[in-house]
Structures are given as C-alpha cells and as structure tokens.
Amino acid sequence: MIKIILISLALIFVIIGALISALAAIGLLRLEDVYSRAHAAGKASTLGAMSLLFGTFLYFIATQGFVNMQLIVAIIFVLITGPLSSHMIMKAAYNIKTPYTKKTKVDEISEDLKDTKL
C-alpha cells in the first residue's frame, strides 16, 4: 500500500515538474527582455527541476527501498545554482546596460548603486 502511494506521489511530482519546466520554456520564448527571461528561467525551471528530481527520489524509495543520496545532492545543487545563475545573468546584463522593455517603469538597481561601483 505504501509502495503504491509513493509511486503515485512520484508520478504527481514528475508531472508537476514537467509542466512547470514547460511553462518556463514558454516564458523564455514569450517574454520581451533578458531580465524577464532570466527571471522565468531562474524561478520556474528551478522549481520544475526540483520537482522532477524529488519525484525520482520518491520512485527510488518505493521501488528499491533505499534513499538515493545522489538525488539529494542534485536537489540541493539545483536549489543553490538555479537562482544564483539567473541573478548573475541579470547582473551582467545590467552592467553592460542591456535595455529594458518599454513596460518597465522603475529602475531600483540604479538607486541602490549610486554610491558603489560594480
């Protein structure tokens, strides 16, 4: 009974992760500037990849009966590097003065960086 529940939960997490990753891909195609695209990639794809890995983790627990430490390390790695990489992409784009979309009205970064040099 527990095995069926764990496999069902694993399937749900894999489907949710695939849907979130697909939404991130759509966001990369539809959004207008590099900042919005990096935001979509950093947030949604990180959550999608973590859901996929957690579903795989649950599947291994249900079918093989042990905890796969490689998946735990991969989940932690994605959790740390996904948002960090999108932040660095946006920071590099800001430093080379990549233009915003016309809908962007506020530049909060310039207000924060008046006294500091990047």
Curated annotation (Swiss-Prot):
Organism, as annotated: Staphylococcus aureus
TM ranges: 7-29, 44-66, 71-90
GO MF annotations, alphabetized: sodium:proton antiporter activity
Physiological role: Mnh complex is a Na(+)Li(+)/H(+) antiporter involved in Na(+) and/or Li(+) excretion. Na(+)/H(+) antiport consumes a transmembrane electrical potential, and is thus inferred to be electrogenic. Does not transport K(+), Ca(2+) or Mg(2+).
Subunit (UniProt): May form a heterooligomeric complex that consists of seven subunits: mnhA1, mnhB1, mnhC1, mnhD1, mnhE1, mnhF1 and mnhG1.
Location, primary (coarse class): membrane
Any one cellular-component term (Gene Ontology): plasma membrane
Subcellular location: Cell membrane
Disulfide feature: none
Alphabetical keyword list: Antiport, Cell membrane, Hydrogen ion transport, Ion transport, Membrane, Sodium, Sodium transport, Transmembrane, Transmembrane helix, Transport
Lineage: Bacteria, Bacillati, Bacillota, Bacilli, Bacillales
Membrane topology: Multi-pass membrane protein
Pfam family for this entry, one: PhaG_MnhG_YufB
Annotated family: Belongs to the CPA3 antiporters (TC 2.A.63) subunit G family.
Name the record gives this protein: Na(+)/H(+) antiporter subunit G1
Description of how activity is regulated: Na(+) extrusion is completely inhibited by the H(+) conductor carbonyl cyanide m-chlorophenylhydrazone (CCCP).
NCBIfam families per UniProt: CPA3_mnhG_phaG, PRK12587.1, PRK12674.1-2
